[in-house]
Amino acid sequence: MAGTASTIRRFAFAFVAFGGLWTEPACAENSYDAAKLEAEGAVIGEIVLDKANVFDLNDPAENNAFYRLANLIHVVTKDKVIRKQLLFESGDAYSKRLADESERVLRQNQYLFDAKITPVHYENGVVDLNVATRDLWSLQPELSLSRTGGENSTTIGLDESNLLGSGTRVRFMRDEDVDRDQTIFEISDRHVGNSWVSAAIRYADNSDGHSHGISAVRPFHELDARWSAGVRLWDDDRREALYELGEEAAEYQQEREYYSAFRGWSKGLQGSHARRWTAGIVYDDNRFGPVVDGSLPAAIPEDR
């Protein structure tokens, strides 16, 4: 419509708390040559976890009431969550490559600021390792208020990426806009049990339908990994509208079923490279029909 004025107001709120700069663990002053450890066939002995909270209270800049309270509230990542992501264990031959890859695996977590794995003691062919990690603040509120073209939109939610130090992510969100109202719940874990399987579940209850999804994926988690596999299932039912001059002019109901599965193969690390093959199958079915008790003319696309 010509001459129509549109006013947009947006408000966003987020609380993000980060730790201070990473400092080397106290034991880092003991330096051991990784190549020498490997050449001498060093065996991994004790694996010590050195876990730091979000804020370093030994730093005067971070030692205040607010940061002390944040550290008190925050649950530091549990030992078992760290250990199950290591590519080695006590009794294995020491490998600098596996230590470096384990650091990479740990750093991929949203709830960790950094990770360092350092040999700290070597005697009689046995090397002890220090695994130093530092947590990030993991609870993030979500709040967004906006107004566009006379219509209000509201989003409110909570996103916890490290529930009680378990490494599990939980997200709850309530979203209301001109198209639909949604209540969304998501839960995911990158390492289910003691496995390398990453699983996620999403449930959304909408004013015009629903949206459900589940996935389980075992990735190539290291350079020498020999296989990967995964499945994804998605079911979605919603009302869609067609607009003319900013107003709803027609509508239809869409039902979608999406399923996929894949399998990957590899001979593992060969020299300095790894070659991988992946094959999969996808089923994607979209069906369209009239909206039950609809108030607008139906404009129904062809199924595909």
Protein language model features and the residues they cover:
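Immediate N-terminus of the mature polypeptide
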Residues: 2-13, 22-304
